[in-house]
A protein has these predicted regions:
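Polytopic transmembrane helical bundles with strong interfacial aromatic enrichment
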Residues: 2-90, 94, 108-148, 157-190
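Divalent metal-coordination and catalytic microenvironments
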Residues: 97-98
């Protein structure tokens, strides 16, 4: 069964990429703190605006230009911190987590489909390896780059070889399925 390695790889790869979910949850704690801080300082600015920036709402004293600029700076920094925290989560979510889960499931489906396709073994092996290597050189390298912060992985990802392999695998699977899809598992002969 040529597709077996894709099914096994798919489930193991899914464990790795799905495990990024709890990592992102841990980063949401930082997001919660940053969002709370932003709420406080922006709320203070809203109070100042309601008073037309003339007096401090807590002390009712006249507001100096320095106090107003400090309040603005604190609000800007708090919003920047919140955006940076969100960017860390999105950096993982939009890359290795989403693509990894998708490519893991794609390998599982391809592995099962290969069991039902009567075609030359070399072509089935080619399709199988295109999906495995495509997943490793796309989502796998995104994982290394974004989770372990290895910059060399980004250089390899940017070549686009991983997605190209997956697209070629999809094309090959489509052609093989047109000609050889059976309603029951097939036996492969070398």
């Amino acid at each position: 069964m040529i597709g077996k390695k894709n099914v096994v790889f798919g489930f193991l790869f899914l464990v790795l990429t799905a495990a990024l979910g709890p990592l992102m949850v841990l980063k949401y704690q930082d997001w919660g703190a940053a969002n709370g801080q932003r709420g406080q300082v922006v709320g203070y600015l809203q109070q100042l605006k309601a008073g037309e920036y003339l007096e401090n709402p807590e002390t009712l004293e006249d507001l100096s230009a320095k106090q107003l600029s400090v309040a603005n700076a604190e609000a800007i920094l708090a919003m920047n911190k919140l955006a940076a925290t969100e960017q860390q989560i999105d950096f993982i979510k939009g890359g290795p987590h989403a693509h990894g889960n998708l490519e893991a499931l794609l390998n599982i489906v391809v592995g099962i489909a290969l069991c039902f396709i009567a075609a030359p073994v070399r072509l089935k092996q080619l399709a199988s390896w295109l999906f495995i290597l495509g997943s490793i050189t796309h989502a796998g390298l995104l994982y290394l780059e974004r989770v372990f912060m290895l910059p060399w992985a980004n250089m390899l990802v940017s070549t686009g070889i991983g997605p190209v392999m997956i697209l070629l695998g999809l094309l090959l699977m489509g052609v093989l399925a047109i000609k050889g899809f059976q309603g029951e598992p097939v036996k492969d002969y070398p």
